[in-house]
């Protein structure tokens, strides 16, 4: 997992990923499992990482294994730890996915395999975009409630009693975490 910031103009800066892959390429050998966990746009594992590793002349899924598995840690959260947070993984080939899942099964309670690295990359962007939108929404609702003289906390607590279709978010400063505000930018950039 390496940093994946945005450039000064708001484009994904994947230079850290490329540097890491260049280092791996110098020592790549048979039976190596490589898993990218850095948040990035769909296609990075296939179009960038795999493309750089092809220079090794080894065969993916046979000689070495390449997967994407989004980092899903919530620092400081005692309820959801590395062990009990399901791990999503998608490999370049079925053999890659299988070996990656085998590794993570030693660490986490549940591994969720998906059909491709692009799917796994998109999972992380959906999760964080969903969070970003809903935090923004609840902050707007808090402003409206204040203007209306309504207790936003009472509204949220009452809405949270609905057993489906509502997930509780609470208002506060900012979005929380460095990645939440920038992750939707990756998706926006890729779709251009």
Residue ranges of model-derived segments:
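Structural/interface elements that position substrates and couple domains in central-metabolism enzymes
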Residues: 1-192
């Amino acid at each position: 997992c390496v940093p994946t910031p945005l450039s000064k103009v708001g484009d994904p800066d994947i230079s850290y990923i490329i540097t890491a892959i260049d280092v791996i390429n110098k020592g790549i050998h048979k039976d190596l499992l490589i898993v990218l966990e850095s948040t990035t746009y769909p296609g990075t594992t296939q179009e960038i990482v795999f493309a750089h590793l092809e220079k090794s002349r080894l065969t993916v899924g046979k000689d070495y294994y390449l997967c994407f598995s989004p980092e899903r840690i919530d620092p400081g959260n005692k309820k959801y730890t590395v062990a009990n947070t399901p791990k999503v993984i998608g490999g370049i080939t079925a053999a890659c996915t299988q070996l990656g899942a085998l590794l993570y099964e030693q660490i986490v309670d549940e591994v969720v395999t998906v059909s491709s690295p692009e799917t796994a990359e998109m999972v992380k962007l959906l999760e964080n975009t969903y969070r970003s939108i809903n935090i923004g929404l609840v902050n707007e609702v808090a402003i409206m409630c204040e203007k209306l003289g309504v207790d936003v906390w009472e509204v949220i607590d009452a809405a949270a009693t609905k057993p489906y279709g509502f997930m509780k978010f609470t208002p506060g400063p900012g979005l929380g975490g460095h990645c939440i505000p920038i992750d939707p930018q990756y998706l926006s950039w890729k779709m251009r």
